[in-house]
C-alpha cells in the first residue's frame, strides 16, 4: 500500500498519524507480498524507537479479517505511546471492542480511545 505517515512535534507534544502505513496482510495476496508488507511496516515502526508519543492515530481495519489487529498491536508493543485513536474502521466501530476483548491488547487497552460515531468530539 502506498501513502504517508507523519510524526509531528508541536507545543512540546509529539503526534503520530499513520496515514495508510499499516501491516497490510491480505489472504488473497501471495506469501511473498505479505512478508514484504510485514517487513516494511516493522522497519518503519522501528524508526519511532525512543520517541515519547503523546497521541497517535493508528490503522485498525476490519477488512483484514483475522489479521485486523496485527499492525495496531505491533505499533503499540514497539512504541511509547500515551493515547491512541484507531482509524480506518469503515464505521465498523465494534472492531475496537473486538481488539479490547483480546488478551493480546492487555498491555495497552487502557490507552485506546474508543470511537463510537462520526463527528465524535474528545477532550484530552
Stretches with model-predicted labels:
Residues 47, 68-124:
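Binuclear metal-ion centers of metallo-dependent hydrolases, dominated by the metallo-beta-lactamase
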Residues 1-7, 54-64, 108-121:
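A broadly tuned preference for mixed-charge, low-complexity surface segments
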Residues 27, 66-69:
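Active-site-adjacent loop/helix micro-motif of nuclease/hydrolase catalytic cores
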Residues 16-20, 32-36, 55-63, 82-90, ...:
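Active-site neighborhood of phospho(di)ester-bond hydrolases with catalytic His/Asp-centered motifs
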Residues 1-52, 119-124:
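Core dinuclear metal-dependent hydrolase active-site scaffold
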